[in-house]
């Protein structure tokens, strides 16, 4: 039998969780409210002023389990302004460049906690990560 003395290890979300958010986004507000209600300490980064970098996306996309194209905010004005023919033919490199140049093109919020990256707000997924 192993007996542990001393302080309990911190919960999995003890480090600050990075949330890329847009103040006018209802989904972001819901996600931030949920995180607050579950005592998750967050660092909010405004996604429009500070969109994700290519390096961040290269690390986060595989951890999210979503293909890069699913990171596009298809309901926003920036997306609607894209040339649909060009969008259909776009390679990942071009989509990556768009996402780094226009934060409104990124589906939000983006929540980064350790090895977990969540895109959008899905209460069940948040509960699995943050308990």
Give, region by region, the residue ranges found by the protein language model.
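Short, flexible segments with low predicted structural confidence
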Residues: 6, 31-33, 70, 82-83
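N-terminal amphipathic/basic-hydrophobic helices that include classical n-h-c signal peptides
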Residues: 1-7
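Local sequence-structure signature of Cys/Sec-based thiol-disulfide redox active-site neighborhoods
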Residues: 9-38, 42-45
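Thiol/selenol-based redox catalytic cores and closely related redox-interacting motifs
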Residues: 47-131
């Amino acid at each position: 039998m192993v007996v542990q003395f001393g302080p309990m290890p911190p919960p999995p979300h003890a480090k600050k969780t990075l949330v890329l958010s847009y103040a006018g986004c209802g989904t972001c507000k819901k996600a931030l409210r949920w995180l607050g209600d579950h005592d998750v300490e967050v660092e909010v980064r405004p996604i429009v002023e500070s969109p994700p970098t290519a390096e961040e996306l290269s690390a986060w996309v595989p951890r999210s389990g979503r293909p890069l194209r699913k990171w596009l905010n298809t309901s926003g004005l920036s997306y609607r302004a894209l040339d649909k023919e060009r969008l259909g033919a776009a390679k990942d490199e071009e989509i990556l460049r768009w996402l780094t140049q226009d934060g409104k093109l990124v589906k939000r919020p983006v929540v980064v906690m350790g090895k977990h990256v969540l895109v959008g707000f899905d209460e069940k997924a948040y509960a699995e990560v943050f308990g």
